[in-house]
């Protein structure tokens, strides 16, 4: 059991899809806790493989990735795994927020953001 009396296997599995190494590391460090299991991939191809095998509870998804746009991946996730929650993280394109939410993202988090904003967004999406 963890400190909050949840069984370890009841922890939320989170997939971070982010190609920038520093940002991915910051996200992993910010999310490191007994309530979450955090995995990271660098591109959409690996994200699709991971989701098909592991079906995480939440995907933190960058928009501009080496092999495509995260917005396009949202459609795939919502069609195949509607129960998976999605938070789009982006700072490049202001129009991405409207597109991400219209496509099915549960929340949009604009870079840069604080650890508190990240945790608040995750709490709102998962609860």
What is the predicted function of each stretch?
Residues 40-58:
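Acidic, metal-coordinating helix/loop segments flanking the phosphotransfer/catalytic sites
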Residues 43, 69-72:
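Acidic catalytic/metal-coordinating carboxylates
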Residues 20-39:
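Two-component/phosphorelay signaling modules centered on CheY-like receiver
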Residues 71-81:
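Short amphipathic alpha-helix used as the core "switch/output" element in two-component signaling
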Residues 1-15, 116-127:
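Non-catalytic signal-transmission and effector/linker regions of two-component phosphorelay proteins
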Residues 72, 92-109, 120:
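Alpha4 helix (beta4-alpha4-beta5 surface) of REC/receiver domains from two-component response regulators
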Residues 62:
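Active-site residues of response regulator receiver
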């Amino acid at each position: 059991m963890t400190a909050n009396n949840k069984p370890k296997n009841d922890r939320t599995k989170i997939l971070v899809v982010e190609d920038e190494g520093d940002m991915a590391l910051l996200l992993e460090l910010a999310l490191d806790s007994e309530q979450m299991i955090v995995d990271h991939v660098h591109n959409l191809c690996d994200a699709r493989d991971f989701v098909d095998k592991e079906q995480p509870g939440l995907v933190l998804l960058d928009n501009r990735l080496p092999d495509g746009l995260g917005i396009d991946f949202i459609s795939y996730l919502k069609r195949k795994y509607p129960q998976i929650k999605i938070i789009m993280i982006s700072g490049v394109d202001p129009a991405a927020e409207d597109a991400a939410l219209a496509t099915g993202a549960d929340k949009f988090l604009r870079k840069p953001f604080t650890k508190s904003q990240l945790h608040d967004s995750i709490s709102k999406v998962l609860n």
